[in-house]
Amino acid sequence: MTSDEFSALLQRLMAAAEAGDAQAFAACFTPDGIYHDYVYGDHTGRSEIAHMISDLFHRDAQDYRWEMFDPVCDGCIGYAWSLSCFISKVPEFAGRPVVIDGMSRFELKDGLISDYSESVNGGVAMAQLGVHPLRIEKVLQRWGKQLQERPATRAFLERPKRTKS
C-alpha cells in the first residue's frame, strides 16, 4: 500500500465513523480484521466491527468527530496521530463534551486494515466526563495490568536493554 492509498483509506474510515455508517467503516477492514478498542474491547470480523460502531460508539456518543494527521505507511504497517471529540450520551455523563488525542497503528493487508490498535489516554476522557477519581484509578489500574500482560510487553521486559528479538 502506498502512502497515498493509506491516506485515502484513513479518509474513508474517518468519514464512515463520523457518519455512523457501520458497514462502510467495517468495509475498511479485511473480513477477519480486528479492531482493538480500549473502552469496548476487541472486535473481530466485519460484523463485530460494524456492531461496535453502530451499537456502541454511536449509542454512547453524538456529534462524533475523528481526524487523523501525519499518516505514515511502509506498505504493511501504518501510523497516524488523531484527534477525536464527541458529546456523551451515556445517561450518567449525558451532554458532556470530550476531546482526546491518540496514536493509531494499522496492520495492512490487500489494501485494507487487518489489525487496528490505538494508544489513547483514557484518563483524560474520563476526567472530562466527570468520572469519580476512585473509578478512574480502578480503570487505569486495570489498563496497566492489561499492558503488563500483553505478549509484546512481556517479551520486551524479559530481554536485556538494547536488544530486540
Predicted regions and their residues:
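A beta-strand edge to alpha-helix "cap/lid" segment located at domain peripheries
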Residues: 57-165
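A solvent-exposed, acidic/Ser-Thr-rich amphipathic alpha-helical stretch
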Residues: 22-26, 30-78
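Short, low-complexity N-terminal intrinsically disordered segments enriched in polar/charged residues
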Residues: 1-31, 146-165
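A generic structural signal for short
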Residues: 1-2, 41, 91
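Short acidic-hydrophobic sequence patches enriched in Asp/Glu that either
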Residues: 5, 44-48, 98
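Helix N-cap and loop-to-helix transition residues
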Residues: 2, 21, 44-45, 121, ...
